[in-house]
């Protein structure tokens, strides 16, 4: 299972219970910003690749810094695109925020992009999220119970 994944499963529970959670948006691609934000008490940071110059290739590194500083990492993707959603989830994101979801079909497409068959369309590429294959079963359980899809 990815780095301390079992210690970072609070966000979905808190959101489901309408509890207060403290997070912020990350639009600057620099680890020092993440370190500063972690000392401010944030529980999660959302990497915004829709409205910033952060690229998909930066996401893996930023997720590692966010999680390494004890916070959960969400990624706001730039579109409801299964390939992009799969990439950020494979990079180890704790969840994804999908913009421009305007219909039930849009929502179903976003959720299917996060999940594996038979509930989704995500292909298996053993990467950071699944601890490079060692924790795939645990990751599937985590994905089902704790992944955040907004």
Per-region residue spans from a language model:
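Hydrophobic faces of well-ordered beta-strands that scaffold small-molecule active sites
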Residues: 20-26, 45-47, 73-77, 96-98, ...
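Alpha-helix-loop-beta-strand connector modules within alpha/beta enzyme cores
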Residues: 56-90, 112-119, 142-146
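Conserved anion-binding
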Residues: 83, 95-150
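Glycine-rich, proline-tolerant flexible connector loops at the mouths of alpha/beta enzymes
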Residues: 33-61
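Glycine-enriched alpha-helix->loop->beta-strand junction motifs that scaffold or abut catalytic
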Residues: 40-44, 90-95, 115-116
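N-terminal amphipathic alpha-helix/helix-capping segment at the start of soluble metabolic enzymes
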Residues: 1-23, 136-147
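Conserved, mostly hydrophobic/aromatic
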Residues: 24, 37, 48, 88, ...
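Short, acidic/polar
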Residues: 26-40, 79-87
């Amino acid at each position: 299972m990815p780095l301390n994944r079992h210690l970072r499963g609070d966000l979905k529970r808190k959101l489901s219970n309408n509890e207060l959670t403290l997070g912020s948006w990350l639009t600057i691609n620099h680890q020092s910003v993440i370190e500063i934000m972690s000392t401010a008490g944030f529980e999660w940071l959302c990497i915004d690749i829709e409205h910033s110059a952060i690229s998909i290739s930066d996401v893996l590194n930023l997720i590692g810094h966010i999680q390494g500083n004890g916070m959960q990492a969400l990624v706001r993707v730039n579109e409801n695109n299964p390939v992009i959603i799969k990439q950020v989830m494979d990079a180890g994101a704790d969840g994804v925020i999908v913009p421009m979801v305007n219909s039930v079909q849009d929502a179903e497409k976003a959720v299917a992009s996060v999940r594996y068959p038979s509930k989704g369309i995500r292909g298996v590429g053993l990467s950071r999220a699944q601890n490079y294959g060692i924790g795939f079963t645990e990751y599937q359980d985590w994905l089902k119970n704790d992944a955040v899809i907004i």
